[in-house]
């Protein structure tokens, strides 16, 4: 990123999120943005390629979850180009982060970024979300799960809740339809052992879509039957 874009990143995180980025953190975001644009020419990572939009719609949007992250072990499911997992990792070096995606080429990009930014305690996982959540090494071991994936909330809940320890939180980044998706999720919440704790609303800017973060707390152990086999939650959501 150019110096003016670095300045914009620092200003927006300070003004919109009350987050003061260090020079080292801004440099990491700058490298991340540059690599995202470079790799996007050969791997479909994002439709957002202008520096100002990367800053606002990827970096600032991801960091809106920062104050809600709890615990020392986080999984970002359907991470894609690393959002929100990598931005959160840059600001939370002590948290162990797992970046989960089903497309190997995206994970190749993330491995490159992780190495160049010298990030530690971060792992990429090549897996479908359903398979990852059924793995006994990962199931019910996370304090926090995040996702900006496009699936609707009942589907995301079946991916995320089985990964959480009791008392852990799923942070689902959503658009203006968040309340509607919550209403669709009553059955999924009951079946999976979770409840909605809060819906945090925010706006990235005058022309940007209203955003929401849905906070879901795991209240009891998830039955062994969930998540169902890969593909089933999307085709037959718990509604």
Swiss-Prot record:
Q: Say which enzyme class the record assigns.
A: transferase
Q: Where in the cell is it found?
A: Cytoplasm
EC code(s) of this entry: 2.1.1.-
- The answer to keyword Cytoplasm applying to this record is yes
The UniProt GO MF terms for this protein read: rRNA (guanine-N7-)-methyltransferase activity
Alphabetically list the UniProt keywords.
Answer: Cytoplasm, Methyltransferase, rRNA processing, S-adenosyl-L-methionine, Transferase
Task: Indicate which residues the UniProt annotation says bind S-adenosyl-L-methionine.
Answer: 78, 83, 129-130, 148
Name the HAMAP family on file.
16SrRNA_methyltr_G
Please state which protein family the record places this protein in.
Answer: Belongs to the methyltransferase superfamily. RNA methyltransferase RsmG family.
Please tell me one Gene Ontology term that the record gives under cellular component: cytosol
Briefly state the protein's biological role: Specifically methylates the N7 position of a guanine in 16S rRNA.
Where mainly located? cytoplasm
> Which source organism does the UniProt entry give?
Desulfitobacterium hafniense (strain Y51)
The protein's superkingdom reads: Bacteria
Query: Which Pfam families would you find in this protein's record?
Result: GidB
What InterPro entries does this protein's entry cite? rRNA_ssu_MeTfrase_G, SAM-dependent_MTases_sf
Q: What is this protein called?
A: Ribosomal RNA small subunit methyltransferase G
